[in-house]
Amino acid sequence: MKKTAILPVFCLILLSFCTGKTDKPITDGQPAPDSATVEVTEIIDTVPKEIIIEKELLYDQHTLEDTYPYKDTTREFQWEKIKERLTWLESIQKEPATWSILQNYRNKNGEAPLVKNYHRDSYRRIADSLGVERFQGIPLYLTTDTTVPELYGRDGALVKHLEDYTNFTRVASVHTGKEWMIPKKYIQTIPDTIVFKKAVFVDTRNQNIATLEQEGDKWLVRSMNPATTGLHRPPYAQETPPGVYIIQEKKPRMIYLVDGTTETGGFAPYASRFTNGGYIHGVPVNAPR
């Protein structure tokens, strides 16, 4: 069966692949384990192999060096951290598993219920105790209590798909391994024909971005460029949230508005949306005034 690569995004790190299995019909009221819970006897190499990174640029404009000056400081590409994430990315694909994406762009799957503990953030929006906003959020319920959500998940986030029930899906966080129950309408299961062979790493501290592609036993650097990530500037601009996300949408050009208006501010080429209204894109062009 032909495998297809999809792009994951890491902040620091973005991704591009998932392995999933076709869900079996579920008997009403009875939980049915998906393929990720089936016991498989397999010998797995427990010693992580060395990650080999080589530069083979496909985009060579505005390329940065590994370390470069910026104003009165020095910035860098954090290759050791990138290797750690790539090791993780390879390791999660060694064993059979099903992966899913959390989705609720512009509340298209319904406004999430209020969590147990919430507050108004600096944008005057409802947020959970960790600062994740209700708007575009995905309700995360404890496995022992599906009446009121505990926290919100972020749109575009990658999760491990564990088990399907009538109205809920049990998933595990790729960061902590903690398990949650999520209403099915917020879950998009990734087909098992998908593999992670490309990754985008966004470094919000050093303000740079690197794209890599796996070929054989090597990861090839396809681009190394400066990046301007989001800033915390209420009431409009927001910082780029950390995490591992899957590219959900691509546009040849993305129209953006002047803050607080419906007036077109300009456009940005080659835009890829990874979480909420957050895009990776080319250099924006302002509309003529």
What residue ranges belong to the model's regions?
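Bacterial signal peptide processing site
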Residues: 19-21
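Sec-dependent signal peptide hydrophobic core
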Residues: 5-10
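Gly/Pro-biased beta-strand-loop elements
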Residues: 164, 183-289
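SH3/SH3-like beta-barrel superfamily modules
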Residues: 29-116, 150-188
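Positively charged n-region of N-terminal signal peptides that target proteins for export
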Residues: 1-4, 122, 126-128
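C-terminal motif of bacterial Sec signal peptides marking the signal peptidase cleavage site
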Residues: 15-17
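Short, structured beta-strand/loop micro-motifs enriched in basic residues and often containing a Trp
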Residues: 133-145
